[in-house]
Amino acid sequence: MLAEEALLHGSFLLHYQPKIALDTGRRIGFEALLRLKKPDGSVIGPTAFSAAFDEPILSRRIGSHVLRCAVAQAKAWATAGVDFGHIAINVSSSQFIGLPGSPCLVDEILGATRSAGLSPRHIQVEVTEGVMLSEQGGDIGTQLEALRTAGFIVAFDDFGTGFASLVHLKEFSYDQIKIDGSFVRAMTGSSADHAIVKAIIDMAKALGKQVVAEGVETVAELHALRELGCNYGQGFLFGRPTSASDLRVLPD
């Protein structure tokens, strides 16, 4: 299997996409995105190995690999004196499952960051609604609350695309809401999508949550999000996902 071979041969790697404070334009962190390097040197995205995430044990192994790589990169930047903000990682439903002989997700994240001498502020956790709907996950709400209590920021990813986003927003514990890029990309040409983005931002403010807009690609979208009071953004307008070696991480 492609994913198993990638884990065995160390072919999985992380690319990093910057996250920006929309009011100042300052970079506040990165999202780590999984990629696979093929023998010919080309790099492919997760759609090529998405089937691996349907297998709980394999998916958990991949998630643990992503955590280790993100923590190692955060430590490298911190050691070099780079003010990188944070690295956000996506967590799958399989990672919430307790397996014999393996630490629970909370202990795994805490252990990895502490061993690297990092603060919880250096690593963020992003969870999609698909994880909430999955029957594979364990006591997700309790684990998310434990992460927040320990000082980690938890984000509700791809908000607005699921079947029960509002229900899960009420039932689970989050610090940030990430607006799905499909709404952001359509908002300047569609009054309906603009209204949806505005409603999400207003709701988040009322709940005391921060908002991240995904998929920001144009200056018009940036201006519209600023006018609505969106806190943060990420997308091709600010930078494409790229390897750590190709990133410009020194102060502007």
State the predicted function of each range.
Residues 26-28, 58-139:
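Catalytic core of bacterial c-di-GMP phosphodiesterases, primarily the EAL and HD-GYP domains
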Residues 47-51, 60, 141, 145:
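Conserved long alpha-helical elements within nucleotide-processing catalytic cores of c-di-GMP signaling
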Residues 32, 52-53, 66-74, 108-109, ...:
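Structural preference for long, well-ordered alpha-helical segments in enzyme cores
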Residues 74-78, 114, 141-149, 198-205, ...:
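Surface-exposed amphipathic alpha-helices with a cationic face
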Residues 6, 22-26, 36-39, 92-97, ...:
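EAL-family c-di-GMP phosphodiesterase catalytic domain
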Residues 1-13, 53-59, 95-102, 106, ...:
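C-di-GMP signaling machinery
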Residues 15-51, 70:
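A short, well-structured catalytic beta-strand-centered motif of the EAL phosphodiesterase domain
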Residues 69, 77, 82, 118, ...:
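Structural motif
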